[in-house]
Amino acid sequence: MSYLLDPSRKTITIPKLQAMRDAGEKIAMLTAYDSSFAALLDYCGVEMILVGDSLGNVMQGQQTTLPVTLEQMAYHTECAARGNQTSLLLTDLPFGTYPTPEAAFASAVTLMKAGAQMVKLEGGDWLAPIVKFLVERSIPVCAHIGLTPQSVHALGGFKVQGKTNAGAAQLKRDALALQAAGAQVVLMEAVPAALAGEITQSLTVPTIGIGAGADCSGQVLVLQDMLNVYPGRKAKFVRNFMDGQTSIEAAVRAYVAAVKDGSFPAAEHTFSA
């Protein structure tokens, strides 16, 4: 399944993302776990498609991402890759699959062969040697800092990170260390907006935020969250883009437009220290 794309739509590459960041053009990212939604996101102009281990929550009904396996991530990556034509497709390395540089490389190769163009790893400055090992072996990396869902039990729940002076200083060290190790993108989750802005200014690579304020180079949401698939309580950083729309395509286009013009995230979607 594929859409007839606008001829002006160019393939999104890592240099293109860097150029967007340097020019101040916002980057839109959403999750997709299958061919049909990947094709739709690509058609709607989403620059980055994340095959996230969030599939454990939204596809499998798990309470955390921890049960998701590498084989499951590879399967969903294959599905999404078949629908994608021009967006940059990145995939999460699931919990427990990157304890050492060698193990991380083997896991990343599995995902790259399945169609990923970049892998995402969760962790702080301790992750730098693993990132360096991957990048030196032609595996592009997005480093995920702040609230790292794979560490939910160690963190004591899904809590905002970097609210104390010590926590903020550590996140700054994490970001710089991971960039120095070769990470081409840094994703920040549930980080006070002012801190995320400072980190973005301190880096030269693009930053992607989810609950990290409007000053990041781009934004990401879980597709099912922004489509309001789930009733009830939602994370503070989620906005219902189906509100007022008559189709999923229209909702996705509204999200892309809101990211591009800076109206999302608004103040109500962000955290303070």
Curated annotation (Swiss-Prot):
Enzyme Commission number, as recorded: 2.1.2.11
Primary location class: cytoplasm
Origin: domain of life: Bacteria
Entry keyword annotation includes Hydrolase: no
One GO process term, biological-process aspect: pantothenate biosynthetic process
Reactions mediated catalytically: 3-methyl-2-oxobutanoate + (6R)-5,10-methylene-5,6,7,8-tetrahydrofolate + H2O = 2-dehydropantoate + (6S)-5,6,7,8-tetrahydrofolate
Disulfide bonds: none
SUPFAM superfamilies per record: Phosphoenolpyruvate/pyruvate domain
Pathway membership: Cofactor biosynthesis; (R)-pantothenate biosynthesis; (R)-pantoate from 3-methyl-2-oxobutanoate: step 1/2
Top-level EC class: transferase
Cofactor binding comment, as recorded: Binds 1 Mg(2+) ion per subunit.
InterPro entries noted in UniProt: Pantoate_hydroxy_MeTrfase, Pyrv/PenolPyrv_kinase-like_dom, Pyrv_kinase-like_dom_sf
Residues annotated for 3-methyl-2-oxobutanoate binding in this entry: D53, S54, D92, K120
Binding site for Mg(2+): D53, D92, E122
Cofactor: Mg(2+)
A GO cellular component entry from the record: cytoplasm
Active site, renumbered: E189
GO MF annotations, alphabetized: 3-methyl-2-oxobutanoate hydroxymethyltransferase activity; magnesium ion binding
PANTHER family for the chain: 3-METHYL-2-OXOBUTANOATE HYDROXYMETHYLTRANSFERASE
Record's function text: Catalyzes the reversible reaction in which hydroxymethyl group from 5,10-methylenetetrahydrofolate is transferred onto alpha-ketoisovalerate to form ketopantoate.
Oligomer and partners: Homodecamer; pentamer of dimers.
Name by which UniProt lists this protein: 3-methyl-2-oxobutanoate hydroxymethyltransferase
Organism: Cupriavidus necator (strain ATCC 17699 / DSM 428 / KCTC 22496 / NCIMB 10442 / H16 / Stanier 337) (Ralstonia eutropha)
